[in-house]
């Protein structure tokens, strides 16, 4: 049995609101295996973004355990959590968050150089990913010169630049029109499968969810099979 790329065990997350406590996650259990693409669905306000933030080590759970590639994350220092994020995780958000003054290729080079990769191999990796996304002719364009779909495809390339083991995506096509969303989502699936990653992708779109390997629903603070 392969080591899960991501495992949550009885994860809870509560927030204080004055004298009241808001329980967003109430014992979430989830495993995502290497090479598996899992859709995370649920109504607005169910806590999908909170769950992804915890999976990405950007928030700490109130209780429970998060394991990334078999590594228990609860007692890690902030420096160690940062390294684990850098080396094991990739993130795609609803908005692309590209650096406007840099070209498409440079946006993909930056996280690699932060990780200690030299500029030449970083540029080669950027060119490889952009080619897979059908953007070779756009690699020298800045974000403002790209369409919304192209910007999001560059953001996906950036997320995969450091060859993560796990991709986390929060409504990655939510800002796009239906036709563009379809093209971007298919490109995302093709690239994730080609790279052999595990992925947890939050979406409100049931048609997109059904194209993934498995669907889980966040309901009343727990993760249940769809």
UniProtKB/Swiss-Prot annotation:
EC top class named in words: translocase
Binding site for ATP: 42-49
Cited SMART domains: AAA (SM00382)
Organism: Rhodospirillum rubrum (strain ATCC 11170 / ATH 1.1.1 / DSM 467 / LMG 4362 / NCIMB 8255 / S1)
Keywords recorded for this protein, A-Z: ATP-binding, Cell inner membrane, Cell membrane, Membrane, Nucleotide-binding, Translocase, Transport
Family statement drawn from the similarity comment of this UniProt entry: Belongs to the ABC transporter superfamily. Lipoprotein translocase (TC 3.A.1.125) family.
Function: Part of the ABC transporter complex LolCDE involved in the translocation of mature outer membrane-directed lipoproteins, from the inner membrane to the periplasmic chaperone, LolA. Responsible for the formation of the LolA-lipoprotein complex in an ATP-dependent manner.
Subcellular location: Cell inner membrane
Coiled-coil regions listed in the entry: none
Name of the protein described by the UniProt record: Lipoprotein-releasing system ATP-binding protein LolD 1
GO cellular component, one term: plasma membrane
GO-annotated biological processes: lipoprotein localization to outer membrane; protein localization to outer membrane
Designated gene of the protein: lolD1
Keyword Transferase on entry: no
Domain ABC transporter stretches: 6-226
């Amino acid at each position: 049995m392969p080591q899960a790329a991501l495992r949550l065990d009885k994860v809870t997350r509560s927030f204080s609101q004055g004298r009241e406590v808001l329980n967003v996650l109430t014992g979430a259990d989830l495993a995502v295996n290497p090479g598996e693409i899992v859709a995370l669905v649920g109504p607005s306000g169910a806590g999908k973004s909170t769950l992804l933030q915890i999976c990405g080590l950007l928030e700490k759970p109130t209780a429970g355990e998060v394991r990334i590639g078999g590594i228990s994350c609860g007692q890690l220092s902030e420096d160690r959590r940062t390294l684990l994020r850098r080396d094991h995780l990739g993130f795609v958000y609803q908005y692309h968050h590209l650096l406007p003054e840099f070209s498409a290729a440079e946006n993909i080079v930056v996280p690699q150089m932060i990780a200690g990769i030299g500029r030449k191999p970083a540029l080669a990796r950027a060119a490889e990913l952009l080619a897979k996304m059908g953007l070779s002719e756009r690699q020298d364009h800045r974000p403002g010169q790209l369409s919304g779909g192209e910007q999001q495809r560059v953001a996906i390339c950036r997320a995969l630049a450091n060859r993560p083991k796990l991709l986390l995506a929060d409504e990655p096509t939510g800002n796009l029109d239906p036709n563009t969303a379809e093209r971007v989502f298919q490109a995302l699936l093709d690239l994730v499968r080609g790279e052999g990653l595990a992925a947890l992708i939050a979406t409100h779109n049931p048609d997109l969810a059904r194209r993934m390997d498995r669907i889980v629903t966040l309901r009343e603070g727990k993760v249940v099979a769809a």
